[in-house]
Structure formats: structure tokens, C-alpha cells
Design a protein with these regions (language model features):
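Alpha/beta enzyme core
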Residues: 2-181
Length: 181
């Protein structure tokens, strides 16, 4: 749900959810991540061909990301029922709602441990505090996001690639503001 209809305009065929599963099967993707509705409707026809990462939380890109939070809309039990191979969770590091996010992630991680499911965390810096310390794509913010996801129990962490921006990097805490990358 983070990728709304506008994301499909460059490739109109991708508007069809089944296209994504067909492409993943034909190209032998290592996995396909999707929300519960797509997984329930399309995954049964591709089980065994395409490994599934069930995203258990998500948000639209309609509201600003200043107070980013992705509510859970599926469970680890749903993933087990569907035959998923892993759980996906988006964590917004630095958001004013980070405490809620971490509590929600704790429950998801406990359920992953209980069911033996690997946990993939999309760890993205967001919010005014992040903006004030170099921005969401600074090395500082990405490094922190990686570390937090690992410490929270992620088996795999998905991050944005840091972008070097000397003008913004000077706002990062030491020693990040002095690093030459």
C-alpha cells in the first residue's frame, strides 16, 4: 500500500496484481513482498514457485511522513496459514510515533520467533528530528536505522542507500558530521 496507483503508470501492465506474481515466477525472483489481500487472492496459484514475504503493516503515501506509522493489517498467523516464507515489517526510525512502532514490532518479532518465521524489516528514517540531523538519506540516519532494526531482531534489513550531501551532513551528530565518505 506504500506504492499507490501512480507508481504503476510507467508500466501499465503492473496495475494488474497478478502480473507481479507472474513476473516473479518467470524471472525466478528470490521473493515477492505484498500485503494480505494480494497474498490471499493471488499467492495460492504461485505457492512453491515464488517465495512470499507477507508485509504485516503498511501505510499510504497520502499523509505526510512527518508522523509516519504503519499499522498492522495482518498477522504472523496469517503468513503461516498462507505458507509464506518470511514476514515483512516497515519501521519508521525517528518518527514521533516511534514508540508505538517499536511496541508493535516487538509483538511481530515475538510471533515470528514463536512460529519460526524470518523477519525482514524495512527500516526508514522519518520525521522532523531526522530532518534536523541531516535528513532521512544521511549516512547518520541510515546507519541508525540499520542498527535499530538489527537490535530489534531483524533477520534481514532493507534500507535506502545513503546520499552524501555536505550541506545537510554538517547537521548530523558527531562524528557523522566530520566524516569524509
Amino acid at each position: 500500500i506504500e506504492h499507490g496507483p501512480r507508481d504503476f503508470f510507467p508500466n501499465p501492465a503492473s496495475k494488474d496484481p497478478e502480473y507481479q506474481f507472474k513476473l516473479a515466477a518467470e524471472a525466478k525472483y528470490s521473493a515477492l513482498a505484498c500485503q494480505i489481500g494480494m497474498a490471499e487472492k493471488y499467492y495460492p496459484d504461485y505457492a512453491g514457485e515464488v517465495p512470499l514475504i507477507l508485509k504485516v503493516n503498511g501505510k499510504t503515501d497520502i499523509p505526510s511522513s512527518a508522523h509516519a506509522f504503519s499499522a498492522c493489517n495482518a498477522t504472523v498467523e496469517d503468513a503461516v496459514r498462507l505458507g509464506a516464507d518470511a514476514i515483512g515489517y516497515t519501521l519508521y526510525v525517528g518518527s514521533p510515533r516511534q514508540d508505538e512502532d517499536l511496541a508493535q514490532l516487538r509483538q511481530v518479532r515475538q510471533d515470528c520467533d514463536r512460529f519460526g518465521m524470518p523477519l525482514v524489516v524495512w527500516s526508514y528514517p522519518r520525521g522532523e528530528a531526522v530532518d534536523a540531523k541531516g535528513g532521512p538519506n544521511s549516512f547518520y540516519a541510515i546507519d541508525y536505522a540499520a542498527r535499530l532494526a538489527m537490535e530489534m531482531g531483524a533477520d534481514v534489513v532493507k534500507l535506502n542507500m545513503p546520499k552524501i550531501n555536505p550541506e545537510k551532513d554538517k547537521d548530523a551528530p558527531a562524528p557523522y558530521n566530520e566524516m569524509e565518505v
